[in-house]
Amino acid sequence: MEGIIIKGIGGFYYIKTDEGIIECKARGKFRYNSLKPMVGDRVTIKVENGKGVIEDIHERSSELIRPTVANVTQAFVVFAIKNPDINLDLLNRFLTLCEYNDIHAVVCLNKEDLCTEEEKENLKELINDIGYEVLFINAKEGKGFDALKERLEHNITVLCGPSGAGKSTLLNSFIDREHMETGSVSEKIGRGKHTTRHSELIDVDNGYLVDTPGFTTLDVTFIDRDSLKYCFPEFNDYNNLCKFNGCNHYKEPKCAVKEAVEEGKINKLRYEFYIKTLEEIINRRGN
């Protein structure tokens, strides 16, 4: 029997299968192989005498460590437009982590009622130009909710962003609606409102939302210096046009990315963030 881990706590894993949610423990072989089951894992299980056992963990498409979730395909990167104002450095860190983990990012700008149409257009243009879709939402009033739901189907979606951006309000909107339809599921895995200590998948519209304690680190300096440039989608058209193979768009001459920045084709602030991050990586690793 196959299923997906929707919650794990105290050595027990709750697997959603076609026959319902089954409580399982993991075979000891995983511990010996230093492979621990994660929320989001697709698994093969066996049930004997009413007890479930995880027999196999399928290959993962992605693996987040903090929070610990496997097979995430999409991120709603939630920032408030105002109160607090957008921290572009922090937004760039979230987007870099998404790119590194091959997770499709959608930027969700909350509290859209606090800014003018002109301000919204400027933000949309800025974020579209670096390769990301933007949705304007009002989490408290439910505005933009349907547009988010459309993007959940067939995805495992994580909510991320700074404190105060509206993630909890948005998540509770999904939980409240789903709880009315699937209250028995909530009771089975012991979900209440709403202090998250462990990552958990919530079944929403033929997809899953990750209820998570949050990203406990936004350090991006673990990324290899030669890989960082691939975390910036707007560089893609220029990476192979530089004079030197393997150009990192730093101090190398005749660099197509630097020329694109000078010509206004690549956002200067994004490039400056890239250079700052690259220097952090070089200084930390001493190479």
Swiss-Prot record:
Residues 61-218 form the CP-type G domain. Keywords: Cytoplasm, GTP-binding, Hydrolase, Metal-binding, Nucleotide-binding, Ribosome biogenesis, RNA-binding, rRNA-binding, Zinc. Its EC number is 3.6.1.-. Binds 1 zinc ion per subunit. The keyword Cytoplasm applies. One of its GO terms (molecular function) is rRNA binding. Gene3D superfamilies: Nucleic acid-binding proteins, P-loop containing nucleotide triphosphate hydrolases, Probable gtpase engc, domain 3. GTP binds at residues 110-113, 161-169. It holds the Pfam family RsgA_GTPase. One of its GO terms (cellular component) is cytoplasm. Zn(2+) binds at residues 242, 247, 249, 255. InterPro entries: G_CP_dom, NA-bd_OB-fold, P-loop_NTPase, Ribosome_biogen_GTPase_RsgA, RsgA_GTPase_dom, RsgA_N. Its cofactor is Zn(2+). The keyword Transmembrane does not apply. It is found in: Cytoplasm. One of its GO terms (biological process) is ribosomal small subunit biogenesis. HAMAP family: GTPase_RsgA. One of several proteins that assist in the late maturation steps of the functional core of the 30S ribosomal subunit. Helps release RbfA from mature subunits. May play a role in the assembly of ribosomal proteins into the subunit. Circularly permuted GTPase that catalyzes slow GTP hydrolysis, GTPase activity is stimulated by the 30S ribosomal subunit. Monomer. Associates with 30S ribosomal subunit, binds 16S rRNA. PANTHER family: SMALL RIBOSOMAL SUBUNIT BIOGENESIS GTPASE RSGA (PTHR32120), SMALL RIBOSOMAL SUBUNIT BIOGENESIS GTPASE RSGA 1, MITOCHONDRIAL-RELATED (PTHR32120:SF11). Belongs to the TRAFAC class YlqF/YawG GTPase family. RsgA subfamily. This is Small ribosomal subunit biogenesis GTPase RsgA. It comes from Clostridium perfringens (strain 13 / Type A). The gene is rsgA.
